[in-house]
Structure formats: structure tokens, C-alpha cells
Amino acid sequence: MTDFNKLQSVKRQFFAMRNGVLADYMRRNGSPYRIIFGLNLPQIVDIARQLGEDDELAEQLWANDTTRESRLLAPMLMSAAQLTSDHLMEMAETISDVEVADNFVHRAVRRSGDVDRLLTRLGGSERAIERYMALRLVYSRVESDFARALTMAEAELQRDEPLTRSLAAMVKADAEWYAEEN
């Protein structure tokens, strides 16, 4: 019987759960990943629950930047100790697509103890995808930090960046509503 390391076992799970129709659709629509198994997010969340926190495996998966599912699973396995602003910024600098950016913010960045610093660093980036992540992050806090959300959204709307335009407009609208209510 063959023994597999953790990374190989996870990849075998991806393969067993693959969805060729979804994978082909993603490829045709410009997904930047060379390898796409076509798993949906609930399937990836189930795998993460089975594995539990595992920083070493999370780093291996994140380094596997040619595989979509590896990039989606990695943030789910990270322990709180790994969620430093410096480490998360290093990871953010390697993100190139919205799906991974959304998942990264939801599964890792929001759990960081240094959200304010990350908001400042991501929001001040020259890379549109990092500013997109900052908007996603501030949007999750718009009720409690509407002034900052409004400032960030207005600044991003001034840039007129296609990637962030609609999200910035949503953040602005919600921040204005909360500002009126308070």
C-alpha cells in the first residue's frame, strides 16, 4: 500500500471530488490557474474541517500557486499565530484573482488581530486587487467603521478602476446609509 504525505492526500481528495464541467467553465472564462479541479467552496470548507488547523500544510498549499483549490483551502487551515499583518501582506502580494482574494479576506484577513493595519496597507497599495481586498475587508466592518469605509470607497471611486468600481460604489452606498442613521 502506498503512503501519501498530507499534500498528496489533499490533492487526491481534490481529484476524487473534481467537477469537470465547472473546471472547464472556469478555464473558458479566464481563470488564471493551470490546474482547476472544479470543487465548489462548500466542498473545500468540508476538507478544511476534516484537516483542522495545519500551518505547514497551509504554507505548502499556498505555495502551490498553479492550483485553484490549493489557494482556496490554504487560508482555511491557518492558525491565529500565522495571521500576522506582515505574513498576510506577503500572501496578498501573490493573489491575482477575485475568487481567491474574497476567500483570503473572509477566511484569513478578517481573523487577524491587526485588521486596522491591514486595511491601511492593502488600501494604500498600487495593485488594484489589494485595494479590492481592502474594500472587501472594510465592507465587512461598514456598520462599525462607516467613516473609514466611506473615505476608502470615495478614494477608490476617484481611481475609476474597473476591478474595484462596483464594490467601491456598494461600500459607499452602505457607509452613507450608516452615516445617516447615526
For each of these PLM feature ranges, what is it?
Residues 1-182:
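Alpha-helical scaffold domains
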